[in-house]
């Protein structure tokens, strides 16, 4: 079976635009929630999840072959494509959850009419190579693509030595997921998730001994 573990690495205080990046991502999610709430009737008619996602992206992202119906690209220019797609996925999940709860309320299976809240606590994911780059082995740094208020740029980030030592000792050689930015107690962290394959004991439950 698979076991997923995660660990948050503290980002040392420095003059980098983490707050700007978090804010612009949440603003994008809020905007998209409104868009998908407005267009849910047509989106919900698409049964295949990937096709629904593609249509949701076509609604807001302009390409040579696609004219977007909504002005997301103008409001959030140059947003990295992976981050835009993460925002779309989060917004779709929020609207889908609301619609499910609304249907339960209408069927009298849920007390209290649910509300669709555009305010959110979504945190950006830093996809490897395009948003996140690891430093050389043994160094307590990384590079993140952050929003400085005008553009998306690469910034060096200093990470807490004790946290990095723990990862190197505990998870060396294991593949981590793309890190997610977190904020707790006025501090910022990069949270990494690791997946392990664990073999279950074949001994019958009644014969297992807990030491």
What kind of region is each of these model predictions?
Residues 1-211:
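Nucleic-acid substrate recognition interfaces
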